[in-house]
């Protein structure tokens, strides 16, 4: 058994003992039993009631989920400024909006492309939402290339237009596709390619990686809205509900 497996088994057995006490299986005078006798009683109870194992695993998962939620909320408070006010992150919507959505995305993520349409719908119906875009290229070198190109477009004041065009593109974005789209929307592509190597782009990607890992995001898209974390695609209606909750909590 691996060290991780041993630790997991110990945690399960501990949870089982906790459940056994809850179910009242301990005998009168159990406080006087030896450790070996307590373990034997626990084993007998588990053999008679195998369902205890499943309940113990569920209990561990609930505890882990609760601990992760507490950790995430603490991190949100500590990282609020970096999440919502990073000058190195592009913005959409109302720059003075009363609620900020932070979106983590990858240009080669099909769900992100669909999510962009949902976010655009929200922005069309709620004029008081501010969006921070955290480019998180996790789907290979082509995604990194697309991210570098889009962030470099900020120097030509065409980020939003380029971002929307990249998200509207069908299929996987290879470097040639990215440059073709850049040229089509009027970007100076030689300048764009030179700007793609800027240190601020490296910093944006690194910050996105750090924040996503700290928030336990495992894929794209993912959102932070107020105190809520939303991994996965979210519909415009659900985004609006989360925005309303964040607004009401202010």
Question: Positions of the model-derived regions?
Answer:
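Soluble non-cytosolic domains of exported or imported proteins
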Residues: 33-36, 47, 99, 110-113, ...
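A short structural micro-motif
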Residues: 62-63, 169-172, 184, 199-202
């Amino acid at each position: 058994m691996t060290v991780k497996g041993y630790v997991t088994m110990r945690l399960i057995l501990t949870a089982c003992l906790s459940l056994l006490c809850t179910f009242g299986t301990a005998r009168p005078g159990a406080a006087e039993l030896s450790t070996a006798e307590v373990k034997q009683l626990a084993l007998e109870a588990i053999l008679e009631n195998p369902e205890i194992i499943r309940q113990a695993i569920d209990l561990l998962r609930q505890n882990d989920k609760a601990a992760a939620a507490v950790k995430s909320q603490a991190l949100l408070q500590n990282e609020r400024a970096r999440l919502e006010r990073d000058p190195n992150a592009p913005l959409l919507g109302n720059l003075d909006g009363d609620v900020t959505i932070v979106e983590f995305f990858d240009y080669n993520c099909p769900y992100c492309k669909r999510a962009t349409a949902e976010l655009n719908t929200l922005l069309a119906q709620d004029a008081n939402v501010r969006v921070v875009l955290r480019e998180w290229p996790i789907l290979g070198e082509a995604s990194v290339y697309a991210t570098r190109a889009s962030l470099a477009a900020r120097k030509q004041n065409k980020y939003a237009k380029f971002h929307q065009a990249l998200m509207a593109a069908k299929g996987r974005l290879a470097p040639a596709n990215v440059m073709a789209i850049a040229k089509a929307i009027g970007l100076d592509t030689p300048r764009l390619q030179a700007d793609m190597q800027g240190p601020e782009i490296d910093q944006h990607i690194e910050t996105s990686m750090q924040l996503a890992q700290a928030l336990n995001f495992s894929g794209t898209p993912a959102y932070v809205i107020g105190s809520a974390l939303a991994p996965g695609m979210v519909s415009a209606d659900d985004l609006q509900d989360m925005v309303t909750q964040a607004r009401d909590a202010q």
